[in-house]
Protein backbone atom coordinates (compact mmCIF):
# COMPACT_ATOMS: atom_id res chain seq x y z
CA UNK A 1 0.00 0.00 0.00
CA UNK A 2 2.70 2.47 0.98
CA UNK A 3 4.77 1.62 -2.08
CA UNK A 4 1.81 2.35 -4.38
CA UNK A 5 1.28 5.74 -2.74
CA UNK A 6 4.99 6.54 -2.96
CA UNK A 7 5.11 5.57 -6.66
CA UNK A 8 2.08 7.75 -7.39
CA UNK A 9 3.70 10.71 -5.60
CA UNK A 10 6.99 10.27 -7.44
CA UNK A 11 5.18 10.11 -10.80
CA UNK A 12 3.48 13.43 -10.04
CA UNK A 13 6.71 15.09 -8.87
CA UNK A 14 7.70 16.71 -12.22
CA UNK A 15 4.22 18.24 -12.57
CA UNK A 16 4.43 19.66 -9.06
CA UNK A 17 7.57 21.63 -9.92
CA UNK A 18 6.34 22.87 -13.29
CA UNK A 19 6.36 26.67 -13.57
CA UNK A 20 3.05 28.35 -12.79
CA UNK A 21 1.30 30.13 -15.65
CA UNK A 22 1.69 33.88 -16.01
CA UNK A 23 -0.97 36.46 -15.10
CA UNK A 24 -2.96 36.43 -18.40
CA UNK A 25 -3.64 32.70 -17.91
CA UNK A 26 -4.74 33.33 -14.32
CA UNK A 27 -7.31 35.82 -15.57
CA UNK A 28 -8.96 33.03 -17.61
CA UNK A 29 -9.03 30.59 -14.67
CA UNK A 30 -12.30 29.30 -13.32
CA UNK A 31 -13.31 29.23 -9.62
CA UNK A 32 -12.05 26.10 -7.90
CA UNK A 33 -14.88 25.72 -5.41
CA UNK A 34 -17.52 27.70 -3.62
CA UNK A 35 -16.23 26.24 -0.35
CA UNK A 36 -13.29 28.63 -0.62
CA UNK A 37 -15.78 31.47 -0.23
CA UNK A 38 -17.65 30.98 3.08
CA UNK A 39 -21.19 32.22 3.56
CA UNK A 40 -20.13 35.18 5.74
CA UNK A 41 -17.76 36.53 3.10
CA UNK A 42 -20.41 36.26 0.38
CA UNK A 43 -22.77 38.54 2.34
CA UNK A 44 -20.31 41.40 2.86
CA UNK A 45 -20.56 44.03 0.11
CA UNK A 46 -17.47 44.16 -2.09
CA UNK A 47 -15.89 41.11 -0.45
CA UNK A 48 -17.24 38.68 -3.02
CA UNK A 49 -15.04 39.99 -5.82
CA UNK A 50 -11.86 39.75 -3.74
CA UNK A 51 -12.81 36.28 -2.48
CA UNK A 52 -13.49 35.06 -6.01
CA UNK A 53 -10.15 36.43 -7.16
CA UNK A 54 -8.48 34.35 -4.45
CA UNK A 55 -10.56 31.29 -5.31
CA UNK A 56 -9.45 31.21 -8.94
CA UNK A 57 -6.78 28.64 -9.68
CA UNK A 58 -5.36 27.78 -13.10
CA UNK A 59 -6.62 24.55 -14.68
CA UNK A 60 -3.14 22.96 -14.65
CA UNK A 61 -2.95 23.32 -10.88
CA UNK A 62 -6.43 22.04 -10.06
CA UNK A 63 -5.58 18.45 -10.98
CA UNK A 64 -2.99 18.41 -8.18
CA UNK A 65 -5.65 18.92 -5.48
CA UNK A 66 -6.12 15.78 -3.41
CA UNK A 67 -9.64 14.52 -2.70
CA UNK A 68 -9.91 13.06 0.80
CA UNK A 69 -13.57 12.13 0.52
CA UNK A 70 -12.96 9.49 -2.15
CA UNK A 71 -12.68 6.61 0.35
CA UNK A 72 -15.77 4.46 0.75
CA UNK A 73 -17.48 4.60 4.15
CA UNK A 74 -16.40 2.04 6.73
CA UNK A 75 -18.74 -0.81 7.63
CA UNK A 76 -18.40 -3.52 10.26
CA UNK A 77 -17.92 -6.18 7.58
CA UNK A 78 -15.34 -4.01 5.83
CA UNK A 79 -13.42 -3.50 9.07
CA UNK A 80 -13.54 -7.23 9.84
CA UNK A 81 -12.30 -8.13 6.35
CA UNK A 82 -9.42 -5.64 6.57
CA UNK A 83 -8.41 -6.85 10.05
CA UNK A 84 -8.41 -10.49 8.95
CA UNK A 85 -6.52 -9.60 5.76
CA UNK A 86 -3.76 -7.85 7.74
CA UNK A 87 -3.57 -10.79 10.16
CA UNK A 88 -3.33 -13.31 7.31
CA UNK A 89 -0.36 -11.38 5.93
CA UNK A 90 1.46 -11.69 9.27
CA UNK A 91 4.00 -14.49 8.83
CA UNK A 92 3.63 -15.97 12.34
CA UNK A 93 -0.12 -16.58 12.00
CA UNK A 94 -1.41 -19.73 10.32
CA UNK A 95 -4.36 -18.61 8.14
CA UNK A 96 -6.04 -22.00 8.72
CA UNK A 97 -6.30 -21.38 12.48
CA UNK A 98 -7.35 -17.74 12.16
CA UNK A 99 -10.94 -16.73 12.93
CA UNK A 100 -12.48 -13.59 14.39
CA UNK A 101 -12.58 -15.21 17.84
CA UNK A 102 -9.02 -16.65 17.81
CA UNK A 103 -7.06 -15.55 20.88
CA UNK A 104 -3.62 -14.32 19.84
CA UNK A 105 -1.71 -16.08 22.62
CA UNK A 106 -3.87 -19.11 23.46
CA UNK A 107 -5.07 -20.15 19.99
CA UNK A 108 -2.43 -18.73 17.66
CA UNK A 109 0.65 -19.12 19.88
CA UNK A 110 1.82 -15.51 19.65
CA UNK A 111 3.68 -13.60 22.35
CA UNK A 112 3.35 -10.01 23.58
CA UNK A 113 5.82 -8.64 21.02
CA UNK A 114 3.79 -10.22 18.22
CA UNK A 115 0.69 -8.55 19.63
CA UNK A 116 2.47 -5.17 19.56
CA UNK A 117 3.42 -5.74 15.91
CA UNK A 118 -0.19 -6.64 15.09
CA UNK A 119 -1.46 -3.45 16.75
CA UNK A 120 1.12 -1.40 14.81
CA UNK A 121 -0.04 -3.02 11.57
CA UNK A 122 -3.65 -2.12 12.45
CA UNK A 123 -2.61 1.47 13.15
CA UNK A 124 -1.01 1.63 9.70
CA UNK A 125 -4.02 0.04 8.01
CA UNK A 126 -6.66 2.28 9.58
CA UNK A 127 -4.62 5.47 9.93
CA UNK A 128 -4.88 6.28 13.62
CA UNK A 129 -2.90 5.54 16.76
CA UNK A 130 -4.11 3.04 19.34
CA UNK A 131 -2.95 3.98 22.86
CA UNK A 132 -0.89 1.36 24.72
CA UNK A 133 -3.51 1.08 27.47
CA UNK A 134 -6.14 0.09 24.91
CA UNK A 135 -3.74 -2.04 22.85
CA UNK A 136 -3.04 -4.33 25.82
CA UNK A 137 -6.73 -5.27 25.95
CA UNK A 138 -7.02 -6.24 22.27
CA UNK A 139 -6.37 -9.98 22.33
CA UNK A 140 -8.45 -11.27 19.41
CA UNK A 141 -9.51 -9.99 15.97
CA UNK A 142 -13.11 -9.37 17.07
CA UNK A 143 -11.92 -7.06 19.86
CA UNK A 144 -9.85 -5.12 17.30
CA UNK A 145 -12.88 -4.85 14.99
CA UNK A 146 -15.05 -3.60 17.87
CA UNK A 147 -12.40 -1.09 18.98
CA UNK A 148 -11.92 0.36 15.48
CA UNK A 149 -15.67 0.52 14.90
CA UNK A 150 -16.08 2.39 18.18
CA UNK A 151 -13.30 4.88 17.41
CA UNK A 152 -14.45 5.49 13.82
CA UNK A 153 -18.16 5.68 14.83
CA UNK A 154 -19.21 2.72 12.68
CA UNK A 155 -22.46 1.05 13.67
CA UNK A 156 -24.77 -1.34 11.86
Swiss-Prot record:
The keyword Mitochondrion is annotated on this UniProt entry: yes
Location comes to:
Mitochondrion
Q: Which PROSITE patterns match?
A: CARRIER, PHOSPHOPANTETHEINE
Q: What are the entry keywords?
A: Acetylation, Electron transport, Fatty acid biosynthesis, Fatty acid metabolism, Lipid biosynthesis, Lipid metabolism, Mitochondrion, Phosphopantetheine, Phosphoprotein, Respiratory chain, Transit peptide, Transport
PTM per UniProt? Phosphopantetheinylation at Ser-112 is essential for interactions with LYR motif-containing proteins.
A cellular component term (GO) from this record? nucleoplasm
Q: Which residues carry this modification: O-(pantetheine 4'-phosphoryl)serine?
A: 112
> Pfam families given for it?
PP-binding (PF00550)
Q: Which residues carry this modification: N6-acetyllysine?
A: 88
Q: Please, which domain of life does this record's source organism belong to? A: Eukaryota
Q: Where is the transit peptide?
A: 1-68
The molecular function terms of the Gene Ontology recorded here are: mitochondrial large ribosomal subunit binding; structural molecule activity
Which BP terms does GO give this entry?
Answer: [2Fe-2S] cluster assembly; aerobic respiration; fatty acid biosynthetic process; iron-sulfur cluster assembly; proton motive force-driven mitochondrial ATP synthesis
Q: Does the keyword Mitochondrion apply?
A: yes
Q: Which InterPro entries match?
A: ACP (IPR003231), ACP-like_sf (IPR036736), PP-bd_ACP (IPR009081), Ppantetheine_attach_site (IPR006162)
Instruction: Using the record's annotation, list all stretches that form the Carrier domain.
Output: 77-152
Leader sequence range is none
The Swiss-Prot or TrEMBL record describes its family as follows: Belongs to the acyl carrier protein (ACP) family.
What role is this protein assigned?
Answer: Carrier of the growing fatty acid chain in fatty acid biosynthesis. Accessory and non-catalytic subunit of the mitochondrial membrane respiratory chain NADH dehydrogenase (Complex I), which functions in the transfer of electrons from NADH to the respiratory chain. Accessory protein, of the core iron-sulfur cluster (ISC) assembly complex, that regulates, in association with LYRM4, the stability and the cysteine desulfurase activity of NFS1 and participates in the [2Fe-2S] clusters assembly on the scaffolding protein ISCU.
**Assembly and binders:** Mammalian complex I is composed of 45 different subunits. Interacts with ETFRF1. Identified in a complex composed of MALSU1, MIEF1 upstream open reading frame protein and NDUFAB1; within the trimeric complex, MIEF1 upstream open reading frame protein functions as a bridging scaffold that interacts with MALSU1 on one side, and with NDUFAB1 on the other side. The complex interacts with the mitochondrial large ribosomal subunit. Interacts with alpha-1-microglobulin chain; this interaction is required for the maintenance of mitochondrial redox homeostasis.
Name the PANTHER family for this protein. ACYL CARRIER PROTEIN (PTHR20863), ACYL CARRIER PROTEIN, MITOCHONDRIAL (PTHR20863:SF28)
Q: What is this protein called?
A: Acyl carrier protein, mitochondrial
